[in-house]
Amino acid sequence: MISDPIADMLTRIRNGVMARHEVVIMPASRMKQYLAKVMKQEGFIAGYEVIGAKPKRQLKIVLRYDEGGASFVSGLERISKPGLRVYVQRGEIPRVYGGLGVAIVSTSKGVMTGSQAWRQGLGGELLCKVW
């Protein structure tokens, strides 16, 4: 059993990028789908889909590379962990690499980027940073 499924997801994406894989497959959950949706909206991944039946659903993430073979994901960092949750208010949401990356925040209105949460005046759990 995995103690931190979100960290496992980020690690699988990181390993897939380093190995130059086109897709990575992992066990699916709603939170992972929300994270994949935000990453797709921000252009870090090419797409995602849920495959399989209910008890053993899998999340398939299609990684994105440019013409030179460089990945659009340079780095991923888990912030809030099961043993130490990190919550931020609107003004405490960090900028990632001067706006080149995104902070992903779980708010009362759903999972969104830090800038979207800031614009809506929301704080929440700071899940991870992607750049």
Curated annotation (Swiss-Prot):
The keyword Ribonucleoprotein applies. The keyword rRNA-binding applies. Pfam families: Ribosomal_S8. GO terms for cellular component: ribonucleoprotein complex; ribosome. One of its GO terms (molecular function) is structural constituent of ribosome. Keywords: Ribonucleoprotein, Ribosomal protein, RNA-binding, rRNA-binding. One of its GO terms (biological process) is translation. One of the primary rRNA binding proteins, it binds directly to 16S rRNA central domain where it helps coordinate assembly of the platform of the 30S subunit. NCBIfam families: PRK00136.1 (NF001109). PANTHER family: 40S RIBOSOMAL PROTEIN S15A. Part of the 30S ribosomal subunit. Contacts proteins S5 and S12. Belongs to the universal ribosomal protein uS8 family. This is Small ribosomal subunit protein uS8. It comes from Dehalococcoides mccartyi (strain ATCC BAA-2100 / JCM 16839 / KCTC 5957 / BAV1). The gene is rpsH.
